[in-house]
């Protein structure tokens, strides 16, 4: 619409007007979302692009991402402690790696498959570090959830903020409920989620190197062995994250771990062949420290079963988990 007006275009080029309007919308969205890390990342990336356009300069995609990373860390240093920080920037970095600078044009479906492949494979180390889980059906979930939420739910919800359009909010709710129903159905599939221990640091670093090697330029049409030579070697570097267990007590050693269970107690005692849990921590209304703290710790350490559990007394801060 801006381009159709000679008066407006002469005073402010349409490209500058578009990026300025986009920046305002991104800022409003970030405010509404509580400045969540993905919203901050998008806002700062768009701000870098806007500055480059207004100054008549080109800005590389990696430079835009680097500046966004810098501003997020500068303004919110504690953001690096959140899994969303690493997953958000990691996903965008992977998308850039698999799409930016590639020679030749490909079909949109091929491009989408490449992006899904990169994200699914590339986020494995982070998912294992933070959650000790890998959603095996995430490509299918993303294929359904991302378009519906991005193109339907979010626009309808933002439009409903305007009082005259609040009547469309139930429609957004229905679409979101439909998406959640599908996601719950996918999560009920057997082996929908791979669960394991937290890999040692060296295996994480090896996996990252292996994944980057596998994502080097190649051809989907020509198979995994096409393109950059020996990309299959990346699989070798990835495998240790699944096989190598964390450090375990040696014979004759006793390891005691006091878990941060709030106003309560949960202690894990381990030897080379046995694991005992002393107290389970408190309960938290609909949830408890057992599912939130104790079980993730045991899973992360590669402990599949307890040899014994001792509850010192029946107070909820010791037995609520």
Predicted features along the sequence, with ranges:
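Feature representing long, continuous alpha-helical segments
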Residues: 96, 100, 111, 115, ...
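Hydrophobic alpha-helical transmembrane segments in multi-pass membrane proteins
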Residues: 1-139, 196-251
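Short polybasic/polar patches that bind polyanions
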Residues: 31, 53, 187, 299-300
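Conserved beta-strand hairpin/beta-sheet module of binuclear metal-dependent hydrolase folds
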Residues: 34, 155-158, 250-305
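Membrane-interface amphipathic/re-entrant loop segments adjacent to transmembrane helices
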Residues: 128-144, 148, 152-208, 215
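Metallo-beta-lactamase
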Residues: 306-317
